[in-house]
């Protein structure tokens, strides 16, 4: 019997059942289709272990035109619309970067990394959303910005499936131009720089326009990132271009004041690139024209020189140095989580920077020479060497203690002190929750030297529930609980701007009591993290350097 000829009440029931079946099919479909403002995309259904329901993934969605040809060293432009349904079931190519397989650190860490294609056409994002989510679900959104010193990394590095399924939130992972292509600046109108940051802004604008189609709430967006990704998040907090694009910020082991990732001036990078390029250009306009004509291989050869590359004060994305913007209160007053790991320079960072073999040879005799060289790299005047030795090394002669204190000094200078400074600036206008991640993952103990505690990046496993590139390891029961707690803290923050919730150890806001959370298998509240070191780096050292310089100039006059 045709549907239209059924009795009225039965017709209503039949239509209701059809709609229900259609809705269920839409939830659990192996090939979900969603709209975007430039066309439709087809994703995949993924079952997530230990969760009631699976998720839908949409991989490699373009949020900007390919930044090639005349768009190399230019702001991103809106993507072109497409007809039909675009396939979004495979990971996008990474942005051009040094082949991570060849890095000493990866070999030494015994990590298995699957080769991923690279392309200059790389401005894509991935979306992970609960399978039941639909337009109107209004789920909180978290946008992940990967780390890698602004020279390495990809959206595929961190699999957000577990976090999205466990906490029922929409997660977006974005890519941005890296290295020379992402951050080269001529210091003038020919190439202002910060292209990678402008890509991130374009991705955040795309989220505002489109995330509702995937079940997300564009009025509840939290940006989060680790290392250089944390630096990126922190830079959006101070950038006028990012206003209204997010409502909460999480900075994991990276803020806008990280010394190697922000620069007032572009001269050093400019000269290096100009020399390596062989362009022999008389001015910046000619240099950019020449660089736009370089092949992928030629750009990669230049890139290899940079272990990290700084963003610049370009007058647009960053109108002033982040320190000035923070000090003057010129930033977006959004709630923040800011944190560091116990041993930021315990192993991974020194290996990556090529410092590990130097640190291993430190003795009382060699220490001054090593410190002199390191101080120059850290842009610190030679006058500070004795002060740093006194503060960190004291009178000890033991080489192992000296090496450990040197690593602590590096970690404080590069990560801890900048994070504390940013937290103190931001708490004047919005809640800040500070943490120190202290747990050494059990599965990695055998690979690392015994002195290393929670190293740079160890927290990320407990945020996503998997290690880099989706690698999973057996966790202890205590670690499983820590993982669930960290995920819940992060998701609660995305939902309400406050990480606290039922069945979670209390996390106090960072106020004048200087309380913070020690994130460990047994979380505890700490007070005044590294207060003496903060005083040393921000007050004592600058003051003594000024005094020394003053006495030297008087001596020169005499």
Curated annotation (Swiss-Prot):
Q: InterPro entries, from UniProt?
A: AB_hydrolase_fold (IPR029058), CarbesteraseB (IPR002018), Carboxylesterase_B_AS (IPR019826), Carboxylesterase_B_CS (IPR019819), Type-B_Carboxylest/Lipase (IPR050309)
The molecular function GO annotations come to: all-trans-retinyl-palmitate hydrolase, all-trans-retinol forming activity; carboxylesterase activity; carboxylic ester hydrolase activity; retinyl-palmitate esterase activity; trans-permethrin hydrolase activity
- Identify the CDD domains for this entry: Esterase_lipase (cd00312)
Q: Which domain of life is it from?
A: Eukaryota
Q: Please give the tissue specificity annotation from the record for this chain.
A: Expressed in liver, stomach, small intestine and kidney.
N6-succinyllysine modified-residue sites? 296
Pfam families cross-referenced by the UniProt entry: COesterase
Q: Does the keyword Signal apply?
A: yes
Active site (catalytic residues): 227 (acyl-ester intermediate), 344 (charge relay system), 456 (charge relay system)
What is the annotated signal peptide range for this record?
1-26
Disulphide bridges: 95-122, 279-290
**From the record, what ranges are coiled-coil?**
none
Localization, per the record, is: Microsome
Record keyword Signal present: yes
Provide the reaction this enzyme catalyses. all-trans-retinyl hexadecanoate + H2O = all-trans-retinol + hexadecanoate + H(+); (-)-trans-permethrin + H2O = (3-phenoxyphenyl)methanol + (1S,3R)-3-(2,2-dichlorovinyl)-2,2-dimethylcyclopropanecarboxylate + H(+)
Q: What is its EC number?
A: 3.1.1.88, 3.1.1.-
One cellular component (GO) term of this entry: intracellular membrane-bounded organelle
Which UniProt keyword terms apply here?
Answer: Disulfide bond, Endoplasmic reticulum, Hydrolase, Microsome, Signal
Biological role stated in the UniProt entry = Carboxylesterases that catalyzes the hydrolysis of pyrethroids pesticides. Hydrolyzes permethrin faster than cypermethrin. Hydrolyzes retinyl esters.
User: Which protein family is it in?
Assistant: Belongs to the type-B carboxylesterase/lipase family.
**Name of the protein described by the UniProt record:** Pyrethroid hydrolase Ces2a
Species this chain originates from: Rattus norvegicus
Protein's gene: Ces2a
């Amino acid at each position: 019997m045709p549907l239209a000829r059924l009795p009225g009440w039965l017709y209503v029931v039949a239509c209701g059942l059809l709609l229900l079946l259609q809705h269920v099919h839409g939830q659990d479909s192996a090939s979900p289709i969603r709209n975007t403002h430039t066309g439709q995309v087809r994703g995949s259904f993924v079952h997530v272990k230990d969760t009631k329901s699976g998720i839908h993934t949409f991989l490699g969605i373009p949020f900007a035109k390919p930044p090639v040809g005349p768009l190399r060293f230019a702001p991103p432009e809106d993507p072109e619309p497409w007809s039909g349904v675009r396939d979004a079931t495979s990971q996008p190519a990474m942005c051009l970067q040094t082949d991570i397989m060849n890095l000493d650190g990866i070999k030494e860490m015994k990590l298995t990394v699957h080769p991923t294609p690279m392309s200059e056409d790389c401005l894509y994002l991935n979306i992970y959303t609960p399978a039941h989510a639909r337009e109107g679900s209004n789920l909180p959104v978290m946008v992940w910005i990967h780390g890698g010193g602004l020279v390495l990394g990809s959206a595929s590095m961190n699999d957000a499936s577990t976090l999205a399924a466990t906490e029922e939130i929409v997660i977006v992972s974005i890519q941005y131009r890296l290295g020379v292509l992402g951050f080269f600046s001529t210091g003038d109108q020919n190439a202002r720089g910060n292209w990678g940051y402008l890509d991130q802004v374009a991705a955040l604008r795309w989220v505002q326009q489109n995330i509702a189609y995937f079940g997300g709430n564009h009025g509840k967006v939290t940006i989060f990132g680790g290392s250089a990704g944390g630096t990126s998040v922190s830079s959006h907090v101070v950038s006028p271009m990012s206003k209204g694009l997010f409502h909460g910020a999480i900075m994991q082991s990276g803020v806008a004041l990280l010394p190697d990732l922000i620069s007032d001036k572009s001269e050093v990078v400019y000269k290096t690139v100009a020399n390596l390029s062989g362009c022999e250009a008389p001015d910046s306009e000619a240099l950019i024209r020449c660089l736009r004509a370089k092949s992928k291989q030629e750009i990669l050869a230049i890139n290899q020189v940079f272990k990290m590359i700084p963003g610049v004060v370009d007058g647009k994305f960053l109108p002033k140095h982040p320190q000035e913007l923070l000090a003057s209160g010129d930033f977006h007053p959004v709630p923040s989580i800011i944190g560091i790991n116990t041993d930021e320079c315990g192993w991974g960072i020194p290996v990556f920077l090529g410092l590990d073999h130097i640190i291993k040879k430190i003795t009382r005799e060699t220490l001054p020479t090593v410190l002199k060289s390191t101080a120059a790299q850290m842009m610190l005047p030679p006058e500070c060497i004795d002060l740093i030795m006194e503060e960190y090394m004291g009178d000890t002669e033991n080489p192992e203690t000296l090496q450990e204190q040197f690593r602590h000094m590096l970690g404080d200078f590069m990560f801890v002190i900048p994070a504390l400074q940013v937290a103190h600036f931001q708490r004047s206008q919005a809640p800040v929750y500070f943490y120190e991640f202290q747990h050494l993952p059990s599965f990695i103990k055998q690979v690392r030297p015994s002195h290393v505690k929670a190293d740079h990046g160890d927290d990320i496993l407990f945020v996503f529930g998997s290690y880099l590139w989706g690698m999973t390891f057996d966790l202890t029961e205590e670690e499983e609980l820590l993982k669930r707690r960290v995920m819940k803290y992060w998701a609660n923050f995305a939902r309400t701007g406050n990480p606290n919730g039922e069945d979670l150890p209390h996390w106090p806001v960072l106020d004048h009591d200087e309380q913070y959370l020690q994130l460990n298998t047994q979380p505890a509240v700490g007070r005044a993290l590294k207060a003496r070191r903060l005083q040393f780096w921000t007050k004592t050292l600058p003051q003594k350097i000024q005094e020394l310089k003053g006495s030297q100039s008087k001596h020169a006059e005499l």
